[in-house]
Amino acid sequence: MLVLVLGDLHIPHRCNSLPAKFKKLLVPGKIQHILCTGNLCTKESYDYLKTLAGDVHIVRGDFDENLNYPEQKVVTVGQFKIGLIHGHQVIPWGDMASLALLQRQFDVDILISGHTHKFEAFEHENKFYINPGSATGAYNALETNIIPSFVLMDIQASTVVTYVYQLIGDDVKVERIEYKKP
């Protein structure tokens, strides 16, 4: 089961669109679920995600116009409970102790957060944490040189094989990270 994890698009305010090389990789009919950390910013970005998969879950980012997106969400995909937040609630941004507290409050196997615009994936206390980064490479308040990235999770029973796609220069680099539920 393929799950697309992305966020912080900031279209059209900080970027015009997803990189063309990412659009070629993201084709309708291959992905079953989309988990978005927010900051889509427009209905057009949401509509695009709906063309890729029927099951789209989005949380509200600090720049989203749609106030109907929830602040947080917990979804179950296969054997995994997955928590989804934008990440602007985590102070300081990306702080491990704050993320671990949210993971325990949500009682999830995987916590997905964004806001920093930088990809991260790691295990902590037998739980898995993912920040997909910014799919467009949009700048954040602290940095202008952001590497565009998104994540595909391939969920198979009690294992998640995570593929991070990063656009470095003109090349899409792919890294594989595996997490097994204890």
Swiss-Prot record:
Stated consequence of mutating W93A: Impairs interaction with VPS35L and CCC complex association
Subunit structure: Component of the commander complex consisting of the CCC subcomplex and the retriever subcomplex. Component of the heterotrimeric retriever complex formed by VPS26C, VPS29 and VPS35L; within the complex interacts with VPS35L. Component of the heterotrimeric retromer cargo-selective complex (CSC), also described as vacuolar protein sorting subcomplex (VPS), formed by VPS26 (VPS26A or VPS26B), VPS29 and VPS35. The CSC has a highly elongated structure with VPS26 and VPS29 binding independently at opposite distal ends of VPS35 as central platform.
GO MF term (any one): metal ion binding
Effect of D8A: Loss of in vitro protein phosphatase activity
Xref: InterPro entries: Calcineurin-like_PHP_lpxH, Metallo-depent_PP-like, Phosphodiesterase_MJ0936/Vps29, Vps29
Organ and tissue specificity: Ubiquitous. Highly expressed in heart, lung, placenta, spleen, peripheral blood leukocytes, thymus, colon skeletal muscle, kidney and brain.
Keywords of the record: Acetylation, Cytoplasm, Endosome, Host-virus interaction, Membrane, Metal-binding, Protein transport, Transport, Zinc
GO cellular component: cytosol; early endosome; endosome; endosome membrane; intracellular membrane-bounded organelle; late endosome; retromer complex; retromer, cargo-selective complex
Membrane topology: Peripheral membrane protein
Protein name (record): Vacuolar protein sorting-associated protein 29
Phenotype when changing N39A: Loss of in vitro protein phosphatase activity
